[in-house]
């Protein structure tokens, strides 16, 4: 079939297998060109491995550190007449290139919050790898079924304590709009923490430790975003921020248990704002990102997922002098938080109107990166060609 982008709101409901493969190849080429990372992990579990930062971590571990990787994700395969999800095609491409390089790659498709997927993962590690020495936690999900109680929690994106008026960019109509978000109830905050907080990360590490599949000295990290004051009301000081602060709490107990296990470590890693399927759903993010791209590209400091994660590995996860803040988090977002960058973004924020969107922001760059997520608008891909949407992932365990 010929596959074209079909965008509905902040999601593209189609994905292109050849485009997704080209996108993965581009990230692999970047890592290969940057060169091998010393003291890297050799057996890595990536939870949330199919898109965004999780995919970038899997690529960096494999092609930067020469690691065998086991990836966990929840994606839908394509079938005749219906494309699969971009994460499915990304993972199929990753497997293909890892295999060509002689690297072990196995994936598990299912709900990472469930006990069943944890069990299947532990079995796969025991059978193939023995143990893993690094666990990347990069799940982005709007809901979670609690594995012990069966209760379903939904996350909410709202401020806490007061309503927030904010400017946003309607990406469909391409207009600036003012909007108001009502504050979250306590139940909404608690539910968001249940979905996006640190409980599941801790459950994973506890299960892996108990099963004896974490190597002594193993490290784990979960990815987070902090941002600056422009986004704080909605993000860091809102319901999602409450979940991110829960990560900061939970990491302490995880760090203690790994430290006692042969001197291992657990850290929260703070990464910059990028276009992902998760970030495009946050009301003010498209405008913020369009402005941030404009300013950072002019300064020559613009980075996407792969550049961020490669530097996180090289400098902090594997380096001898990690970028660490006073709260013990690893930081890769310092170029975004450069006061000069933030001041320029803030100034432009107040000046943007419907008439000057394309002059004051890099909305064009934002739109291109958004389409890239789904395998579209990528140079060198023939979008008029007939492609088969049914792509198999070799070495896949279906949960």
From Swiss-Prot:
InterPro entries: Eno_Rdtase_FAD-bd_dom (IPR024906), Enoyl-CoA_Rdtase_cat_dom (IPR024910), FabV-like_NADH_b (IPR050048), Trans-2-enoyl-CoA_reductase (IPR010758). It catalyses: a 2,3-saturated acyl-[ACP] + NAD(+) = a (2E)-enoyl-[ACP] + NADH + H(+). Keywords: Fatty acid biosynthesis, Fatty acid metabolism, Lipid biosynthesis, Lipid metabolism, NAD, Oxidoreductase. One of its GO terms (molecular function) is trans-2-enoyl-CoA reductase (NADH) activity. GO terms for biological process: fatty acid biosynthetic process. Substrate binds at residue 225. Pathway: Lipid metabolism; fatty acid biosynthesis. Transmembrane segments: none annotated. The active site is at residue 235. It is an enzyme of class 1 (oxidoreductase). Its EC number is 1.3.1.9. Gene3D superfamilies: NAD(P)-binding Rossmann-like Domain. The record marks 75 as: Plays an important role in discriminating NADH against NADPH. NAD(+) binds at residues 48-53, 74-75, 111-112, 139-140, 244, 274-276. Involved in the final reduction of the elongation cycle of fatty acid synthesis (FAS II). Catalyzes the reduction of a carbon-carbon double bond in an enoyl moiety that is covalently linked to an acyl carrier protein (ACP). Monomer. Belongs to the TER reductase family. PANTHER family: ENOYL-[ACYL-CARRIER-PROTEIN] REDUCTASE [NADH]. NCBIfam families: EnoyACPredFabV, PRK13656.1. This is Enoyl-[acyl-carrier-protein] reductase [NADH].
């Amino acid at each position: 079939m010929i596959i074209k982008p079909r965008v509905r709101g902040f999601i593209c409901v189609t994905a292109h297998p050849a485009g997704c493969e080209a996108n993965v190849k581009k990230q692999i080429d970047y890592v290969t060109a940057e060169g091998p990372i010393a003291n890297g992990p050799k057996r890595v579990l990536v939870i949330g491995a199919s898109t965004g930062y999780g995919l970038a971590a899997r690529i960096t571990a494999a092609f930067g550190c020469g690691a065998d990787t086991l990836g966990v994700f929840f994606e839908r395969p394509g079938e005749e007449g219906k494309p699969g999800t971009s994460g499915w095609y990304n993972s199929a491409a990753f497997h293909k290139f890892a295999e060509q390089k002689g690297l072990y790659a196995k994936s598990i498709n299912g709900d990472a919050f469930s006990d069943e997927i944890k069990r299947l993962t532990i079995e796969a590690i025991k059978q193939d790898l023995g143990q893993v020495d690094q666990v990347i936690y990069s799940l982005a999900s709007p809901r979670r079924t609690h594995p012990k109680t069966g209760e379903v929690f939904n996350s909410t994106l709202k401020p806490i304590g007061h309503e927030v008026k904010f400017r946003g960019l309607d990406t469909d109509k391409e207009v600036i709009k003012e909007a108001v978000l009502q504050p979250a109830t306590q139940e909404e905050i608690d539910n968001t923490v249940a979905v996006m907080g640190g409980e599941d990360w801790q459950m994973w590490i506890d299960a892996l430790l108990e099963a004896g599949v974490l190597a002594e000295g193993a490290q784990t990290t979960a990815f987070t975003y902090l941002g600056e004051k422009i986004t704080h009301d909605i993000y860091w000081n809102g319901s999602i921020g409450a979940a991110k602060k829960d990560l900061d709490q939970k990491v302490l107990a995880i760090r203690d248990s790994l430290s006692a296990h042969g001197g291992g470590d657990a850290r929260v890693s703070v990464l910059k704002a990028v276009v992902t399927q998760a970030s495009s759903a946050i009301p003010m993010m498209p405008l913020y990102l369009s402005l941030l791209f404009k300013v950072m590209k002019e300064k020559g400091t613009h980075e996407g997922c792969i550049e961020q994660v490669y530097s996180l590995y090289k400098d902090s996860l594997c380096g001898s002098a990690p970028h660490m803040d006073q709260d013990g988090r690893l930081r890769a977002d310092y170029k975004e938080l450069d006061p000069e960058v933030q001041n320029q973004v803030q100034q432009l924020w107040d000046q943007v109107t419907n008439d000057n969107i394309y002059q004051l922001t890099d909305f064009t760059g934002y739109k291109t990166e958004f389409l890239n997520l789904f395998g579209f608008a990528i140079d060198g891909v023939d979008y008029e060609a007939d492609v088969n949407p049914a792509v198999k992932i070799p070495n896949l365990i279906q949960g």
